[in-house]
Design a protein with these regions (language model features):
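Conserved donor-binding/catalytic core segment of Leloir-type glycosyltransferases
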Residues: 140-156, 162-165
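An aromatic- and histidine-rich active-site surface loop
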Residues: 13-18, 32-50, 55-63, 97, ...
Length: 325
């Protein structure tokens, strides 16, 4: 796996991808190319070399994690390539209106298309998978299951969730927390930290799991949490949360407010004690949770966040490109 953010390894990977893209374009006359995030840079390079129009889709914020030792040169070089690819693209796609400000700074407003993200999980949950999830994650009768899907960077805010756990357990000692994601080293490091706090037995780290199992886990949970601190665009996982029909507690930050509000989630300040209060509130108020979950699914419907609507919007974008190139 590549580390997050620009790096020598990522640049080398982009060079290989661009070489393959150029070879593919020379072998077959493509009408246009569609690149997503780093793939947009690759499409820009290949498009310039082969005179093939390209669409650059930028799916969200890039917030570098300086604590992981990002090299400033690669960050600057990545930004340079990204800006050139965005400015010269036949069209650019953003996942919400917040991206328009970025595109306007890059002189892309006239050819910017806003296509809202849709939930990534589209699997039907079979009874057998649901039963397996119940057996794996619910270890006691009457247990409250609180789940978070995310990475281990401050950008994602998992530290807020971890620091809220002792507050939740002081009120709901039968609570069980599930944290999806992370590699073995990250999980080992966090398990050791939780052991020092004496709460490691209340937390389950399944790592990265299959999509069908994740869908089942979200559906059987009592509360889903989104502690994301930074960024401006809604994380895809929140859309999966809304689709699952399980109530949400979220940090009141711009990224979460892009799709969540007091209408469809419990919003709290990004403070551990207050985040814990929101979790406990949903654990003790099933009727509130049911109403928030209903409103969450209505939000997806109202904002047309479905595969059918996504394909229709993408068709319109492609039609625009083909009519102007």
């Amino acid at each position: 796996d590549l580390p997050p953010g620009p790096s020598l390894r990522r640049f080398a990977t982009d060079v290989v991808m661009a070489t393959k893209a150029v070879a593919a374009c020379n072998h077959h006359a493509y009408t246009l190319m569609h690149g997503i995030d780093d793939g947009g840079i690759v499409a820009g390079i290949a498009g310039r070399l082969t005179k093939t129009p390209w669409v650059f889709e930028r799916t969200g914020d890039f917030v570098p994690d300086r604590s992981r030792g990002l090299n400033s040169f690669w960050h600057t070089f990545h930004r340079f390539l990204e800006r050139r690819a965005l400015r010269r693209a036949a069209a650019v796609i953003g996942n919400d209106t917040g991206m328009i400000e970025l595109f306007s700074r890059l002189d892309c407003r006239s050819r910017a298309c806003v296509i809202p993200d849709i939930p990534a999980i589209d699997e039907e949950i079979s009874p057998s998978i649901r039963n397996l999830a119940m057996a794996r994650y619910r270890t006691e009768r009457g247990q409250k299951l609180i789940t978070c899907v995310g990475s281990y960077s401050r950008f994602q805010g998992l530290d807020l969730f971890f620091n809220a756990m002792p507050h939740v357990l002081s009120t709901r000692p039968n609570a069980r927390f599930v944290v999806v994601g992370g590699d073995a080293a990250e999980i080992r490091r966090m398990t050791q930290a939780l052991a020092c706090a004496g709460i490691d037995e209340s937390v389950c780290f399944p790592g990265r799991i299959e999509t069908e199992e994740l869908a089942a886990l979200l559906s059987i949970s009592d509360v889903l949490v989104s502690p994301r601190r930074a960024g401006m665009t809604a994380p895809i996982k929140v859309l999966d949360y809304l689709k699952s029909g399980t109530p949400i507690v979220a940090a009141d930050t711009p990224a979460n407010r892009a799709i969540l509000s007091a209408e469809n989630a419990v919003m709290t300040r990004p403070i551990p004690a207050e985040f814990a209060e929101g979790i406990v509130r949903l654990c003790e108020s099933p009727h509130l949770g049911a109403e928030l979950a209903r409103q969450g699914r209505e939000t997806l419907r109202r904002e047309r966040r479905s595969p059918q609507a996504f394909r229709q919007a993408l068709d319109h974008c492609y039609a625009y490109v083909l009519s102007t190139t």
